[in-house]
A protein has these predicted regions:
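Basic, nucleic-acid-interacting segments
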Residues: 1-203
Length: 203
């Protein structure tokens, strides 16, 4: 199992500024930033038939940054991750090396018709460990979903992985709804309320 802050994140809102395809400033708003316990690293690009699990980082705390659904394509995602890496390196909280597992990305991708506001069914591509593969996975998944919809095939909520050899996503499992994750309080970690006066005292 994985320990997560879930409903009590470190912070909410905020934004990351990127350059869009036209070189213009674009603001990607953040939903929240919260702490989690790293439970392991899935490796999909070594064995074409099996997913390997690296447990060297199990138990190490990680910081999850959740963005609003405002990234339009793979190029913007690449720019967004580049800015995140600059930030964590500047703050000296991580080396930001994706290939070593210090920075990873889970992608939630959906498409919708132009002019509509309702999002389509999202598909998650997990544990991406390369900026370039993130870009390729998003652009592939956008085309795949559009082709399915135009062909009259519904999109199912599922978890997929990216095949770096074939440059395509592959289905892993159907996605559970949030209430099926079986969240429950961790009895060894009691809630800690940090007051403003305590923060001032520590400073």
């Amino acid at each position: 199992y994985q320990v997560t802050q879930d409903t009590t994140p470190i912070c909410t809102e905020g934004f990351v500024r990127i350059k869009d395809a036209q070189g213009k400033d674009k603001r990607i708003n953040l939903t929240r930033i919260h702490m989690e316990e790293d439970s392991g690293k899935s490796i999909h690009d070594i064995d074409p038939f099996n997913t390997l699990v690296d447990l060297n980082r199990a138990g190490i705390p990680l910081l999850e940054i959740v963005s609003e659904p405002e990234i339009k394509n793979g190029e913007e995602a690449y720019s967004y991750l580049s800015e995140i890496r600059k930030l964590v390196r500047y703050l000296e909280i991580s080396d930001g090396n994706m290939e070593e597992g210090s920075l990873r990305a889970d992608l939630n991708i959906s498409v919708r018709k132009k002019g509509t506001t309702k999002f389509g069914t999202k598909v998650e591509v997990k544990n991406m460990n390369s900026f370039r593969n993130v870009q390729k996975a998003i652009d592939f998944e956008i085309i795949r979903q559009i082709d399915l919809i135009e062909g009259g095939t519904p999109i199912f909520q599922e978890t997929r992985t990216f095949d770096a050899v074939k440059n395509c996503t592959i289905g892993l499992r159907t996605k559970e709804d949030a209430h099926d994750y079986r969240y429950f309080p961790e009895p060894d970690l009691v809630p800690v309320i940090v007051s403003a006066s305590y923060v001032d005292e520590v400073r």
